[in-house]
C-alpha cells in the first residue's frame, strides 16, 4: 500500500511499533511466569520434599 499518503504511512509505522511493543511485553510476561513457576517449584520442594521421596525422618 505504498503511495497511500502520510496518514497511511503513520498508521503502518504505528502498527509496527505496536507489534514490537506487544512482542516485547509478552516476552517479559513469559519470563515473569517462568521465574514465578521456578520459585513455586522450589518452595514446594522445600515444603513437601519429604513427600516426594526426598530426605525424610520416616523409617529411621
UniProtKB/Swiss-Prot annotation:
Principal location class: other
Tree of life domain: Bacteria
GO molecular function annotations of the record: bacteriochlorophyll binding; metal ion binding
Binding residues for a bacteriochlorophyll c: 25
One Pfam family, short name: Bac_chlorC
Intracellular or extracellular location(s): Chlorosome, Chlorosome envelope
Lineage: Bacteria, Pseudomonadati, Chlorobiota, Chlorobiia, Chlorobiales
Coiled coil start-end: none
Annotated family: Belongs to the BChl C/E-binding protein family.
Keywords in alphabetical order: Bacteriochlorophyll, Chlorophyll, Chlorosome, Chromophore, Electron transport, Formylation, Magnesium, Metal-binding, Photosynthesis, Transport
Modified residues (N-formylmethionine): 1
GO BP annotations, alphabetical order: photosynthesis
Function description: Component of the photosynthetic apparatus. The light harvesting B740 complex binds bacteriochlorophyll c.
UniProt protein name: Bacteriochlorophyll c-binding protein
Organism in which the protein naturally occurs: Pelodictyon luteolum
Record keyword Electron transport present: yes
Gene Ontology CC: chlorosome envelope
Record InterPro entries: Bchl_c-bd, Bchl_C-bd_sf
Amino acid at each position: 500500500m505504498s503511495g497511500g499518503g502520510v496518514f497511511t504511512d503513520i498508521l503502518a509505522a504505528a502498527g509496527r511499533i505496536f507489534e514490537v511493543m506487544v512482542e516485547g511485553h509478552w516476552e517479559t510476561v513469559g519470563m515473569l511466569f517462568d521465574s514465578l513457576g521456578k520459585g513455586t517449584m522450589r518452595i514446594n520442594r522445600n515444603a513437601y520434599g519429604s513427600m516426594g521421596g526426598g530426605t525424610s525422618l520416616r523409617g529411621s
